Amino acid sequence: MKANLVGLICCPDCGGRFGLVNARVKEAEIVSGKLQCERCAASFPIEDGLPVILRSDARSDRTRKSFGKQWKMHDQKRFEQETIYGKKKEEGLRDFQQAFGIGEFASLRGCVILDAGCGSGVLTADIAKAAPGATVIGVDFSESARLADARCRELPNVHIIQADLSRPPLAARTFDLIWSEGVIHHTPDTARSFSSLAPLVKARGKLYIWIYSKEVRSPYRAARRILRKAYLLPQPALYALAWTLALPLHAANKMREAMRTTTIRHRLASTAYSFYDVLSPEFMHSHSRMEVAGWFRKHGYGGLRFSRETPDIAVCGTKE
């Protein structure tokens, strides 16, 4: 943890400022100690350089462990090798630029950016490298925050936090840009998680989310409906199930591709990872465009831009 992160975070219980207690510093990094609220005295550990600002409960523990295992397997290349959900690194950066209408990353100098649900930190690191003049904060609920921290530790403009997005340890009106792709629909209450993120944006700042649409029908979501309790399976069984389901779908896709009725983006490993992604979480919600637009307007956002590049809901709003 870098010392200047303390000025960017706050107590999730009362919003008070944090002080450092028993901090041990190694090569300009705070590697252990505690963050203690100066108002309510709540404290949270710094573990191997990672601030862990969480409260535990049984339901959230299951979700945290599930996504932690998923990202660890991806990092170990047990699914895809060089892509995430079939996308290469440059495609992730292009999506980020398009979502916010960014021309050049150099224009982000001085901006504070939140990657809300950063997973293992691949995109977080790529954004920080592309925009070295910006400050990038990655937050994830799961143990994958440790992977993100290891990946980003040498980048001077990145901070990683393990925290709950429904109770973020971040002050209102802190961020110029908030990016949250495929994350808040896996929380117990999507609208509540959105309501926790929305106030964090500065005036004229932008908030982007990507979540599942109620209108979309796909083999992945059909599998989720049929196997809705699959998240209770042991991880090895769930891993095997994802690959088992992927094989016939991949074969069918290749046949369609050979007949030139479609161009299939995903390779077999990406298909298996997508099945694992929909079967492993306890929570998975879908919403309508009208519903999501209402969330943005309720929190003072205008200029909504819905992407046409996905059948799901990808939308960016500007804080008025």
Predicted regions mapped to residue ranges:
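A conserved beta-strand element that flanks and buttresses the S-adenosyl-L-methionine
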Residues: 179
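Conserved class I S-adenosyl-L-methionine
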Residues: 206-237, 247-251
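Hydrophobic adenine-recognition pocket in adenosine-nucleotide-binding enzymes
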Residues: 183
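A short glycine-rich, Lys/Arg-flanked "PGG" loop and its adjoining helix->strand segment in the class I
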Residues: 191-203
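Short, glycine-/aromatic-enriched active-site segment of Class I SAM-dependent methyltransferases
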Residues: 217-226, 265-284
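Conserved N-terminal segment of class I S-adenosyl-L-methionine
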Residues: 2-171, 284-285, 291, 303, ...
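Extended, charge-rich helix/loop segments that form flexible
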Residues: 234-270
